[in-house]
Amino acid sequence: MERCDGVMFAARYDPEDGKRESVSEDTESERESESGSESESESEKETESESEKETESESESETGNTGKTGETRKSIGLESVSDSDSDSGSQSRSDSDVEMKEVDASNSNIVSDSSKHKSVLKKLRTSLSAQKAENSTSNSDSDESSVPTHDLAPLPQPALPRDQRLTATTNHIGNLDWLATPIYASTTETVPFSSFGLSSSMVKNLQSNGFSSAFSVQVSVLKLLLPDMESQAIRPDIGGDLLVNAATGSGKTLGYAIPIIESLRNRIVPRVRAIVLVPTKPLISQVKATFAMLSKNTNLSVVSLRSDISINDEAQRLQVVPDIIVSTPGRLVEHLTNGHINLKSLRYLVIDEADRLLNQSFQNWCETLMSRIDSNPISELDQTWRPSVQKLVFSATLTTDAGRLSMLKLQRPRLIIVNDRHELVNELFTVPATLQEYKLSLGSARSSAKPLVLAKFLMSEQKLVNTLVFAKSNEASLRLCRLLQLLFRVFGLDVTVSYLNSTNNAASTRAKILKDFANQTVHILVVTDLIARGIDIATITNVINYDLPNSSRDYVHRVGRTARANQDGEAYTMCFGKGETKWFTQLVREVSRQTEVKDVEKGFRDLVSREDEAKYDTCLEELQRQVFEGV
């Protein structure tokens, strides 16, 4: 009988004997390898012995609760060694069978204990290998620390590819030199039309309509475009595109209409040679009327395209090819897409109110139109001797954003700024030189009586005729118009007030209202920003900003309805509270002007009395009754 680590093995034959011997041999070999290893420390041996003791205790607890089974196991082992060849009777055989079963169960527990022992040893080996790896890492760190150190110095850098990109950017800026070197023109310069060498019929047409002298913007444009046209008769590639920044009402339409008609008056075969793009239908009518006036006694044909007419009807009219087309961008793109217009002979492209057109897509008009213009490939020789499309860009608030202007694909552009102050900013905002601007500031608590303040102000300043009032929306314009009508009636004044917004913007209605306003049948007209740009009435002397504009651009186009064609005009802006006053102060800083904005030295009580407030309350009740009754 042999005993290893508290485990007894019997010499008696058993079917599980082979398994027991293999387990015993594995256990002994593991112990021998562990004891023979010189690298293991004393702590590792103690850990192993503790693991073996735990294994013994677990084995003993599993064989029985009283320890009797262990004694039986020992007795069985002794009997197996001493009396292996004899039997003492049937009772001893049965006892022996029972003992054999118990031995088998004990052996299975031994195998389980051995597997647990292996897992413990496996974890121990893993821990040792991790410790060795950590030691090797620390050794490598010590080796690195032995490397000599040097002072910090900048690392050498390779040649960067961005250097080429910087060169390209510099070249691009060089192409924008025209933005940095504009041509400035005085706002007061005037020259007789007869001194420009115009045809006799053109001078006659101008004089018959009351135009004897050219204003500053017209002088500047004619001085550049007329020589270009003479040079192009010999070298069509000479000249370049033109951008003009001039105040609203300065006469830009005449500035581009005169040279275009002078250039085309001797044409032989009708072709589409000039296209004028404007943002609104009212401007279409005004521009077409100007071209029709100047083209009298010529064979030139002028056609307008607008969205309130059937596109099929316009296509029928276009079969008789016109020389000049006036259109909105969206309607022009429709005809181009349907193949109704051929641009092969196009010479002039005019973009009026360019700031508004470039800010809106209109069926992606700019890209579509430029691609159609560039779709006719020509050789280098043709580029020299064939006239290219000359682009003429006009606006009172002309952008200098290169990103927006690049969409126009400008060629050799020149910039004219009609302004006595020689300055260039990202947005060129200019008001007429003859315009006087005023600000009426009151406390925010008085805003509830805003219509009453306006009525009393117009009465006190004698602004009851030729006055244009701007409101922020259709609803605001309708309400203000009705309240002013009621207030003037209560105050016993015969003042006619009307309104114009998108709710009554039909061509016939609009034309009648504007005609009555120009003839002073309508004394005060309340409008919105959407409608304002189409109003070109020289008799307007007063503009009232009842509601503040949203931007400097809107402000310029509002106040530009007066002081047109070098006439005098006044603009008043109503500010209620510190917030509105601060906003207006910041807004007007971005606008170029000849004179500063003045304050109106009048308080609320200077304008409105207690009796006036009572009358205003009566008007409010009357307006409420009319709304409920649908009057």
From Swiss-Prot:
A motif (Q motif) lies at residues 191-219. Associated with pre-ribosomal particles. Residues 459-608 form the Helicase C-terminal domain. Belongs to the DEAD box helicase family. DDX51/DBP6 subfamily. Residues 24-41 have a biased composition (Acidic residues). Residues 1-161 are annotated as: Disordered. It holds the Pfam family DEAD. Its main location: nucleus. PROSITE patterns: DEAD_ATP_HELICASE (PS00039), HELICASE_ATP_BIND_1 (PS51192), HELICASE_CTER (PS51194), Q_MOTIF (PS51195). Residues 80-93 have a biased composition (Low complexity). Residues 233-416 form the Helicase ATP-binding domain. It catalyses: ATP + H2O = ADP + phosphate + H(+). InterPro entries: DEAD/DEAH_box_helicase_dom, Helicase_ATP-bd, Helicase_C-like, P-loop_NTPase, RNA-helicase_DEAD-box_CS. The keyword Nucleus applies. The Q motif is unique to and characteristic of the DEAD box family of RNA helicases and controls ATP binding and hydrolysis. SUPFAM superfamilies: P-loop containing nucleoside triphosphate hydrolases (SSF52540). ATP binds at residues 246-253. Residues 13-23, 42-56, 94-104 have a biased composition (Basic and acidic residues). It comes from the Eukaryota. One of its GO terms (cellular component) is nucleolus. One of its GO terms (biological process) is maturation of 5.8S rRNA from tricistronic rRNA transcript (SSU-rRNA, 5.8S rRNA, LSU-rRNA). This is ATP-dependent RNA helicase DBP6.
